[in-house]
Amino acid sequence: MRDTQSTASSLSVSIGQATSAGHKAHNQDFHGALVPDERALSFKGITIALADGISTSDVSAVASETIVKSLLSDYYSTPDAWTVKTSASRVISAANSWLYAQSRFAGLADADHGHVCTLATMVLKARTAHLFHVGDSRIWRLSGLSLEPLTTDHHVSLGSGDTVLTRAIGAASSVDIEYRAEPVSRGNVFLLTTDGVHEHWTARTVAQRIAEASTLDDAAQDILKDALEAGSTDNLTVQIVRIDSVPTSDETQFDEQARTLPIPALPREGSVLDGYRILRELHANHRSHIFLAKASDGETVAVKIPASDLKDDADGLRRFLMEDWIARRLDNAHVLGAPASLGPRSGLYVVTDFIEGQTLRQWMQDNPKPSFEQVRDILEQVIRGLRAFHRREMLHQDLRPENIMLDTDGVVKIIDFGSTYVAGVQEAAPMREEDGILGTLQYTAPEYFSGEQVSWRSDLFSLGVIAYEMLTGVLPYGTQVGKVRNPRDRRRLRYRNARDDAHPMPAWLDDALAKAVHPDPARRHDALSEFAANLRSPSLRYTARRHIPLAERNPERFWKTLSGGLALLCLVLATLAFQ
């Protein structure tokens, strides 16, 4: 083999690999590496993997080949919005389940004779090495003359000196994957090895081979020869990865577009922008101008042009361009989509589908006292749209009535992705912390203000506030959420009951709203579907709580009520005594 080197200027590596059956008749190890094109390099990274089939099985070589090939192909088919951890873990788990099923189908119930192997994988993305490990193959970092193991062996030693794997690919229907993330810098050297190699080497010899060899492939071959001469009787595989360069900035393809393309001058009615004939302006604010346009293929679309004030705001322009990227990756009836591109663009703008209808804000003004069923129907459609975001590891982060549209057929769609968090993009190029709160204060979850961990439950909070406002016309905490600065402030928030004389509703419905907007994210619903269900019928928690005595359900209220009753009784008795 020869060195494999990436061609992208941002992340560049050299890879050397070697494998050998050793003194055995068959090689049950398998290995591979993939340096993708520049687009995939940015969003997915470089993958290096090896696997070692167990020696007691005649089909373990199939397992080794399957898991490595799955990673080198299926990993790059996962959504760009996913993190490396999510993408690789899903692929590994799927391959594990398939291999386990193959063994069961073939009647190989004993794991010692099934499609079973170890796995060591490294994915390099931006300035981080993501390590995935199952079994007793290893990943190392070479520092000078020292070898630092970055993985833990998943095996136990027997009295005879043999070992038994406690974790392996294909041994069970599910697999526990060891994961670790390590920062990388130029000059770092990593090694992936099977036990036939690392049980028969020394750090000094490894460092010497890598330093003296003309190529990393030659170094890998020399390391195998040394292990064989040292008495290895197993299959042997080693991969050497040298980091030649890492990204010097957090620039993404969005930043490159923002740097190279100009913001177009605001078009006049009837003018044409790259094949889009402008019909009229639909909306304008400090961030953008939106125009109704007719594409050259006859489709009616919306053209969104950033405001000139954004020209020096790199992060603002990145978020603007990400709106188009997000719209093209969320194929959902309840999320704003984007039409096929007409070709290269001469400037910075995005094109989305045109929604003929009204915002939820306008609908709420037109329907100040909606029926419960109307509210449920709208919220359930929003939930279906939100699921599309969360399945792609995205958070909308600015869910509010102005960012929800109802078309003329009553179909609800989530719009405006300028504040959306995309885990996979954030992993490659983090946004600056000083950007602050991106959403609208009244609808933003308190954990954003207190500096605590945000999650999909943060979007649930926003949805709960919208539901509360649709039913009452006011907000559950007024303006208090925007004043939160720390966890103590968050805990002081007090929910205002939605149920009163002006807004009659079942107590269980008020309970569902209170749970959705609870100040503590952990005490909100466990799934969006749970919130949807609780909008239609009482939750089991609510029903059970109704049957708990007041003294247990709310001791403070019980004793206050009892004390008040006793005080009233004493007053009555005293009055009677003096008559």
Please provide the spans of the model-predicted regions.
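AlphaC helix of the protein kinase catalytic domain
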Residues: 360-370
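C-terminal lobe helix-coil module of Hanks-type protein kinase domains
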Residues: 442-542
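Conserved short submotifs of the Hanks-type protein kinase catalytic core
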Residues: 345-359
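Conserved HxN/HPN-centered segment at the entrance to the catalytic loop
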Residues: 331-339
